[in-house]
Amino acid sequence: GCTSVIDHHASPAYIGGSLSTLRDAFLKVGLRAMTCFETTDRNNGIKELQEGVEENIRFARLIDEAKKATSEPYLVEAHIGAHAPFTVPDAGLEMLREAVKATGRGLHIHAAEDLYDVSYSHHWYGKDLLARLAQFDLIDSKTLVAHGLYLSKDDITLLNQRDAFLVHNARSNMNNHVGYNHHLSDIRNLALGTDGIGSDMFEEMKFAFFKHRD
């Protein structure tokens, strides 16, 4: 079974304190985890962006204090979450840059899951997705990018040069009918994930393999 969870959490009606609730659950059942809140403006604009960043920072600092106290098992870690580039304006990316710098954590973001994400970035910012994130110092060896189906060759080169990670989510891509990532062999640091569609990684491996053979 699963012993570890990497989580990209969203609860727009419950932002502040939500990651602590998750941590309590992980500690209760004894699972290792790394979690974050997916910063976005898609429900409540700039206020939601600010609250999401604040929750990520608060939780990272809570983890730092918990590690020093050693009164609880060290099972849960933090990273800095963002939903997707098309729901995080430059003001939000600047907040995330400061959060990454302040906490020493990496960014966890879904990018290029659909072609729209890329088109939006080109239309509004005139940049490829990861090039835009890199402008805010958000692509490094601690960065986790989910999906990446429509990353450009330049973005893939950037991802590899910065030693960042890409997570392939075969069943989620099939379920959302977004296509297939044909550049997996070009990725240096590649991992397999589920995007929350299940917890059976052996099943995920089977789908990833057979879809690749399709």
Where are these regions (language model features)?
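His/Asp/Glu-enriched, well-ordered alpha-helical/loop segment
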Residues: 135-138, 142, 182-214
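Metal-coordinating catalytic core of metallo-dependent amide/deamination hydrolases
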Residues: 17-149
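Short, acidic/turn-prone active-site loops that include or flank metal/cofactor-
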Residues: 39, 113, 170-175, 194-198
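A conserved active-site cap/scaffold subdomain adjacent to cofactor or substrate pockets
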Residues: 150-188, 192-193
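Short acidic/polar active-site loop segments enriched in Thr and Asp
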Residues: 3-4
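Short, basic, glycine/proline-bearing loop/turn elements
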Residues: 7, 82, 141, 163-170
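Conserved short loop/turn motifs at secondary-structure junctions
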Residues: 8-15, 81-85, 174
